Amino acid sequence: MQHPLELGAAHYFPAEAFPDHRSHRYRSFMIEEILTDPPDAKGTAPPGELLKFGVQALLSARPYHSHLAVLKAEPAAVFKFPLAPLGCSGLGSALLAAGSGLQGGSASPHLPLELHLRGKLEPGGPETGSKAKKGRRSRTVFTELQLMGLEKRFEKQKYLSTPDRIDLAESLGLSQLQVKTWYQNRRMKWKKIVLQGGGLESPTKPKGRPKKNSIPSSEQLSEQERARDAEKPPESLGSPAEVSQEE
């Protein structure tokens, strides 16, 4: 009965590819004698004709220095990444150290990927600069008429609803965002003035939210003005005593 390993070897290799070990009688059970070829062997097949997983390839001793020779012969083919610093200290130093260890400090031709990574990693790159410029808002310069209209409306109405804000912005030639920002800043000053003047409680709740039912509408404001005008006493020409004295 033939050994299974020998059956597998016969399937992958012809009979003349390797010598027949059955005709050789071993003198001892030493590993060296088993692994070495018998003296009457005609010679093994070239390494290129054997597969990597064959019995002959596994038992044959191959020097590992050949792999090192391949690495030393073509260092640029093994390490094809740019070795110059890429702007990021951690990544650039690690790549530079690895490249100097493999190539002995010799510079390799830079790849186009380096320019792409530099733009991404450098803090002053074009993309970061454009984002920083977009985040800044130019300060709005109001005219005297616009400031007078805003102050006059703020005295009457500390908080604006969306329709009122739209009407005020259209009447003053401003945008809704400009009116909203001005009102927020003006309310902060107003709160400080109220607290500094002896007020025990802020006129609004935390986070700038007004109290319940504290935002009067335009109709309510007009009614309050009418009530104030009605409460004022009419201007008289003089008292009755003064009139009698004159007569």
UniProtKB/Swiss-Prot annotation:
Range of residues in the leader sequence: none
Transcription keyword on record: yes
Record CDD domains: homeodomain
SMART domains: HOX
Stretches the record annotates as Disordered: 118-138, 197-247
Primary localization class, coarse: nucleus
Biological process annotations from GO: regulation of transcription by RNA polymerase II
Keyword Transcription regulation: yes
Pfam families the record matches: Homeodomain (PF00046)
Function comment: Transcription factor which is involved with the serum response factor (SRF) in the smooth muscle cell-specific transcription of the beta-tropomyosin gene in the upper digestive organs and their attached arteries.
Subunit structure: Interacts with serum response factor (SRF).
Protein name as it appears in the record: Homeobox protein BarH-like 1b
Primary gene name: BARX1B
